[in-house]
Amino acid sequence: MLNGRCTVTSLTMHTLLPISNAANRERGSATVTALIVVGVAAVLLAGLMWRQQIQIRTLENARDQVQAQWLQRAAIDFARLVLVEDQRNSQIDHLGEAWALPLADGKVADFLKNTDVPDEIAAVTLQGQLIDAQSQFNLANLWDKSFKTINPPGVQEYGRLLDALGLDKNLAQQTAQGVLQLDMPIYDLEGLLKLPSYSPAILEQIRPFVTILPVLTTVNVNTASAEVLMAAIPGLSRSAAGAFVQQRAATPLKSADEITTLLNKMGASQGITLDASLVDVRSQFWLARSEIRMGRGLFVSSALIQRSQNPLPSGNFTQVIWSKTGKVLAD
């Protein structure tokens, strides 16, 4: 009996062990399967959340872009109002006038204290400035009004500017000829890079001193830098140009005739041949620049405004030639 029971027990153990191992394997497989399912679900959920976040960010960016454009329009309208008011009060343009004061970085809410505006708009910051476009050399002066032939006085003026900047003055003639050969007008300074004579380094060197306007223009001697004055007034030395800038700050010139008077007063008129067609004390083109910080982005805007002494076809005294807004920073 004892041997029989031992035999039965031994057989039972040998029979149960394989069953227990099979159950463990099944439980292990179930655990692995569950982990895989959880992992896949987590990946899918993360993907959905990421796509949702992308969609939300895209909508926010689109909203900010539209709001920034509206704020830019408001800033441009304000700039036009300032320019019209300036023309009513003064027949000359100089850096001591209200238009030349930069708009300090401030919140939109500060400008709309008595207006109920949404919190996200009230927190937006804005800064801007008006720049006299005729304080720079206008590259459009390199050609005649029809843009078919080279304008020699404009080429000579640009050559003097390049020389004042330490660049090859022959680049002026190369520019005038090169653009005509391309038979494609340039609308921004980056267009100069299509010419083999220009490099990004040269472009950055001339950028503060040149612009491109839709028509031939004069240089405003009340706002131009010393380098641009050296270009617009043949024979003007660098030291005389610097002294000219200091003198006009105290007493802005009221007419082109006063240019010669000031040069004589400074003792700097010798060797100077003044071309009245190149200079003036008034301007008609202005660059309005603004920076709008909204949400995660910084929107940089610029616009070219033309002001006329007589009403334009629209009936207004100012008009926007072009405007653009770009998002340059995102957190």
Where are these regions (language model features)?
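Compositionally biased linear targeting/interaction segments
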Residues: 9-10, 14-17, 29-331
